[in-house]
Amino acid sequence: MKKNIIVGQSGGPTAVINASLYGVIKAGLERPEEIGSVYGMVNGIEGFMQDRYMNLSAKLNEEELEILKQTPAAYLGSCRYKLPEDLSDPFYPVIFQKLEQLQIGYFFYIGGNDSMDTVSKLSRYAAANGSEIRFIGIPKTIDNDLIHTDHTPGYGSAAKYVAATVREIALDASVYQQKAVTIVELMGRHAGWLTAASVLARKEVGDNPLLVYLPEADFDLEQFALDVKAALDQQPNVVVCVSEGISDKDGTFICEYGSAAQTDSFGHKMLTGSGKVLEAFIRNRYGVKVRSVELNVSQRCSGMVVSMTDIEEAAEAGRAGVAAALKGSTGQMIAFRRKDGETYELECVTEDVNLICNQEKKFPTEWITKNGTDIGPEFWDYALPLIRGEAKRKMKDGLPVYLYRK
């Protein structure tokens, strides 16, 4: 008997999360002898529990699927919904009853760390209660902080956007001779992968950004002041890139120097404002012109500066998820394994989601220079293949054509 697929998107969106959705849908449609319909959860688990879902295989035609592949954000909508820790909670029988009513045999959840926690809990409940539904996680996060995978879909495009934008900011900052400091704040609560990508903006050694600070290295305000002064002595226009999650040796976030940080439903501190704190500090210390720029959500939603490599890998992750489930895998996450050799190649493999969820891959400290203000050449070798390739997209009236859920 044919079984149906259900797929959801969760957490913060990316420029390529819909490419993974595309991969799941296409793989499902290509196996009509095994797959009935492909359903999509509207607003993830939270929406599904409210009986909000749609039949994607019936709704989207081939042209729409191709547009979906290059549409940023999350077509199905997202959520930040934490499943109960206690697997005896009444939540679980209810959701499994809903899945059984739709004759779901394969469940795919596209997301980051917290989404893998969801896959872990559902797969463990299924195993303990004799359910044959197979649960697979499809990775997604611009933070690139999932363990047991070379990188995550979404990171390459976000890194490309960061590098391109910082290069343009550096060009803009260079037009005046008066001393000035531009501080660019980038996403990254505990992992500095995105901020590290700012160094790719440099055309030559010595180009801006002159100073780069990641959460993996303790941040000291007084040393920062000395670093900025030394940079201003070197050239009049200094661009500094900082992660939102930089903290001092006591673990206090720099953004908390200005105000207390709130937390989200998973208990993560909602960080913003480190750039503003540093802007005021340097202005008061040196009296030079200072501005802070917070790229914010544009890092994850920009569809015009995407990596074609990232799009194709995200789609392949979705396809690989379906293939793994049909072969019997459950409680697994699709991961990328980089092959050895001078030419960049990777393969999709499966990893135990229980070993991945609630863990965090930090930026390698050995890739950070000893003074904590720059990134070493190892990162260039790692990151450049991920940002290569430009997408040829459909345009209308000078603007990109995207797919909107109706």
List each language-model region with its residue ranges.
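Gly-rich Lys/Arg/Thr-decorated short loops/hinges at beta-loop-alpha junctions or inter-strand turns
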Residues: 4-8, 68-81, 140-150, 177-180, ...
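Short, ordered loop/turn segments at secondary-structure junctions
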Residues: 10-12, 41-46, 80-81, 112-113, ...
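Short glycine/serine/threonine-rich phosphate/pyrophosphate-binding segments
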Residues: 14-24, 48-49, 84, 92-93, ...
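Glycine-rich oxoanion-binding loops at beta->alpha junctions
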Residues: 51-105, 114, 153-155, 167
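Accessory alpha-helical/coil subdomains and C-terminal extensions
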Residues: 98, 106-111, 117-129, 136, ...
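C-terminal non-catalytic interaction/assembly regions of soluble proteins
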Residues: 255-406
